[in-house]
């Protein structure tokens, strides 16, 4: 009985490490991708158009004032992405990601249906579910949030 309990604890510890590694991978890829998109909007990095270029496009789809909204979206993506990636205030980072994706769905993708092949909501919807899933699960042991548990 004691050996069985020890084995069970060891297996649970291994499963926790694997789950935390999986959450770390998800957070890093999704969070840093969002941070990169924020840097595109704010600074024109990584092939982005900066606030003016992004603002012009936002105005063309009815989001005004374009430059201000580009800066706000860029800040939400940059800050939200970095928080999410680091696992620091993960729920706040996830909320910023979710808000940006909800706006993208409402203003760009909803009229095109579901599938990404027709510019539909598929991809932003998946990102919303990933962010929500991590927020509900927690950032895992390999996160800055874990330091405060």
Model-derived regions, located:
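Extended, low-polarity transmembrane helix blocks
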Residues: 2-48, 53, 59-60, 64-75, ...
